[in-house]
Swiss-Prot record:
Transmembrane segments: none annotated. It comes from the Bacteria. GO terms for biological process: bacterial-type flagellum organization; mRNA catabolic process; negative regulation of translational initiation; regulation of bacterial-type flagellum assembly; regulation of carbohydrate metabolic process. One of its GO terms (molecular function) is mRNA 5'-UTR binding. Interacts with FliW via its C-terminal alpha helices (approximately 44-57 and 63-74). GO terms for cellular component: cytosol. Belongs to the CsrA/RsmA family. A translational regulator that binds mRNA to regulate translation initiation and/or mRNA stability. Usually binds in the 5'-UTR at or near the Shine-Dalgarno sequence preventing ribosome-binding, thus repressing translation. Its main target seems to be the major flagellin gene, while its function is anatagonized by FliW. This is Translational regulator CsrA. Pfam families: CsrA. Keywords: Bacterial flagellum biogenesis, Cytoplasm, Repressor, RNA-binding, Translation regulation. The keyword S-adenosyl-L-methionine does not apply.
Amino acid sequence: MLVLTRKLKEAIQIGDDIEITVLAIQGDQVKLGINAPKHVEIHRKEIYLAIQAENNAASHASKSSLKRLNEQLKHLKGGKQA
């Protein structure tokens, strides 16, 4: 992990197109401004983890839903042939 020290209004450059600037420091909170292309997703860590958990849960639900749908289609197909 790279550790950098920045003062108020100083910035960090990541690659050619991402810049992180220290906008304010109030007690134990630091306000950051991030300039990045629109295609770059930026989230607070706790939000990112919640999104990952939700996506993981949705993928499992989708697999079980597809399995049930497949069983229903087999049942319908079997019913039409009879």
